[in-house]
Swiss-Prot record:
Component of the mitochondrial ribosome large subunit (39S) which comprises a 16S rRNA and about 50 distinct proteins. Interacts with OXA1L. The lineage of its organism: Eukaryota, Metazoa, Chordata, Craniata, Vertebrata. Residues 1-55 form a transit peptide. The keyword Transit peptide applies. It comes from the Eukaryota. Keywords: Mitochondrion, Ribonucleoprotein, Ribosomal protein, Transit peptide. This is Large ribosomal subunit protein bL28m. One of its GO terms (molecular function) is structural constituent of ribosome.
């Protein structure tokens, strides 16, 4: 007899179908249920299931085994480009006959000032060389944030930036360069392919806890009393009836002469 009624790996999905979780927006639930594999950073995948052994010419099965990577809380406040801490062992004194000791491989971090066109603001961010290379490949900081999916960004700070950018694009905020409308229009036109509805942009990058709190606050708003709703409907019906009736014109006695 199994220990649990449902397998452990299904608990998270079952939780999303019950209670307040089930009332979250459908697009946000889809983003939680999508399990995408992040782009390999610390190893090179084979890209195939079989390879030819150069020694004997036989076809052998190969398997991609990802290296376990630890992402500390500091990585959520910067843009590490998918890099993290790798825990492992090394030989003492580089001698294979000596005992193994623990070792932590850390990414090389830099502090850089990055400018966002959409937000018109500079951010002092902790980055890696890979992040700077990815920004160059994307042709700009804003393009890097908007194009990179959540699993590759791997940063709460990055997802918060993406939500802010998407909201400004969706609202066509006039506070961006108010003294230069032409520049503002050029920026919005440059990133028009990333525009999504504002109702969806508000939920981008939220954690499940933040989304539940947002949903709870939306549901706690004072509802409109039913009697007010019925009174408005009654008034509207009476107005429609009055407008639909034909106008009756009474003739005066002097009009017959």
């Amino acid at each position: 007899m199994p220990l649990h009624r449902y397998p452990v790996h299904l608990w998270q999905k079952l939780r999303l179908r019950q209670g307040i979780c089930a009332r979250l927006p459908a697009h946000f639930l889809r983003s939680l249920e999508e399990e995408r594999t992040p782009t390999p950073v610390h190893y090179k995948p084979h890209g195939t299931k079989f390879k030819i052994n150069p020694k004997n010419g036989q076809r052998e099965r190969v398997e991609d085994v990802p290296i376990p990577v630890h992402y500390p809380p500091e990585s959520q406040q910067g843009l590490w480009g998918g890099e993290g801490l790798i825990l492992g062992y090394r030989y003492a004194n580089n001698d294979k006959l000596s005992k193994r000791v623990k070792k932590v491989w850390k990414p090389q971090l830099f502090t850089r000032e990055l400018y966002s066109e959409i937000l018109d603001k500079k951010f002092t961010v902790t980055v890696t060389m890979r992040t700077l290379d990815l920004i160059d490949e994307a042709y700009g900081f804003d393009f890097y944030i908007l194009k990179t999916p959540k699993e590759d960004l791997g940063s709460k700070f990055g997802m918060d930036l993406k939500r802010g950018m998407l909201l400004r694009l969706a609202r066509q905020d006039p506070h961006l360069h108010p003294e230069n409308p032409e520049r503002r229009a050029a920026i919005y036109d440059k990133y028009r392919s990333f525009v999504i509805p504002e109702a969806e942009a508000e939920w981008v990058g939220l954690t499940l806890e933040e989304a539940l709190e947002k949903q709870r606050l939306l549901e706690e708003k004072d509802p409109v009393p039913l009697f007010k709703v019925y009174v408005e409907e009654l008034v509207q019906r009476l107005q429609e009836q009055v407008l639909s009736r034909p106008a009756v014109v009474q003739k005066r006695a002097g009009d017959h002469a």
